UniProtKB/Swiss-Prot annotation:
SUPFAM superfamilies xref list: Xylose isomerase-like
Keywords: DNA damage, DNA repair, Endonuclease, Hydrolase, Metal-binding, Nuclease, Zinc
The keyword Disulfide bond is annotated on this UniProt entry: no
Lineage: Bacteria, Pseudomonadati, Pseudomonadota, Gammaproteobacteria, Enterobacterales
Family matches, as Gene3D superfamilies: Divalent-metal-dependent TIM barrel enzymes
Stated role: Endonuclease IV plays a role in DNA repair. It cleaves phosphodiester bonds at apurinic or apyrimidinic (AP) sites, generating a 3'-hydroxyl group and a 5'-terminal sugar phosphate.
Record-stated family: Belongs to the AP endonuclease 2 family.
Protein name per its UniProtKB record: Probable endonuclease 4
InterPro entries the record matches: AP_endonuc_2, AP_endonuc_F2_Zn_BS, Xyl_isomerase-like_sf, Xyl_isomerase-like_TIM-brl
């Protein structure tokens, strides 16, 4: 079964996120468990935790259908020690918040070398940052998102994702989230079914489907291989509908959150309905 949804707002309280996901007839959702543009947040209260869990139960969302995202400020590969420690503390807090909420995944951008340290050193710092957080939490998997490779951001090549995983001690608690827009901008073609087959065969060989724990389904305003991160609505960008139809009809993408971060929330319900319909089309073929 495919879990299909979008990154919904938690404005007004975390319990509002599953309700908003239900409004667009989603079977998955992503959210921020705190303000993503601030370092600090008030601790979760027992009431907030209970309300969120009750809402998830009410709208039939299990932890496997929810892909929380951490703060954009965090850089787990930061070249400066003080800033690295600040990011590691913030990441641990994010992992602990997931743990408290009964969530089992935390999606994050790996990190940037800021042109100050070697790529290999940055990747090693990211892996060590994950190890530190995993050692102090239980039950939450660190889910590394591939990037478009904009600026000095790492994680845009499958080999970089594999290198981070290689440095993580507990392989059972590390995974990846593939963002289709990021992959396309990083030079992985998805414009035809044949291109999708080739790209994901490469992913399977270098990273491994056993590590795929979520996806972000986004079309791309950015050009192929441009290393520019610009999302678009499904079928309206440079990737086109074929990739998303192909994903919906491939069983390797079952049982993980497939999350829209497309640019027009007003049509998320339509995009989700279209994605669901592609599965039906395959079943009837």
């Amino acid at each position: 079964m495919k879990y299909i949804g979008a990154h919904v707002s938690a404005a007004g309280g975390l319990a509002n996120a599953p309700a908003r996901a239900a409004e667009i007839v989603a079977t998955a959702f992503a959210l921020f468990t705190k303000n993503q543009r601030q370092w600090r947040a008030a601790p979760l209260t027992p009431q907030v935790i209970d309300d969120f869990k009750i809402a998830c139960e009410k709208y039939h969302f299990s932890a496997a259908q929810i892909l929380p995202h951490d703060s954009y400020l965090i850089n787990l590969g930061h070249p400066v020690s003080e800033a690295l420690e600040k990011s590691r503390d913030a990441f641990l807090d994010e992992m602990q918040r997931c743990e408290q909420l009964g969530l089992t995944l935390l999606n994050f951008h790996p990190g940037s070398h800021l042109m100050q340290i070697a790529q290999e050193d940055c990747l090693a710092r990211i892996a060590e940052s994950i190890n530190i957080a995993l050692a102090q939490t239980e039950g939450v998997t660190a889910v590394i998102e591939n990037t478009a490779g904009q600026g000095s951001n790492l994680g845009f090549e499958f080999e970089q994702l594999a290198a981070i995983i290689d440095g993580v001690e507990d392989k059972s608690r590390v995974g990846v989230c593939i963002d289709t827009c990021h992959a396309f901008a990083a030079g992985y073609d998805l414009r035809t079914p044949e291109a999708c087959e080739k790209t994901f065969a490469e992913f399977g060989k270098i990273v491994g489907f056993q590590y795929l724990r979520g996806m972000h389904l986004n079309d791309a305003k950015s050009a192929f291989g441009s290393r520019v991160d610009r999302h678009h609505s499904l079928g309206e960008g440079n990737i086109g509908h074929d990739a998303f139809r192909w994903i919906m009809q491939d069983g390797r993408f079952d049982g993980i959150p497939l999350i829209l971060e497309t640019i027009n929330p007003d049509i998320w319900a339509e995009e989700i309905a279209w994605l669901k319909a592609q599965q039906i089309a395959e079943a009837m073929a």
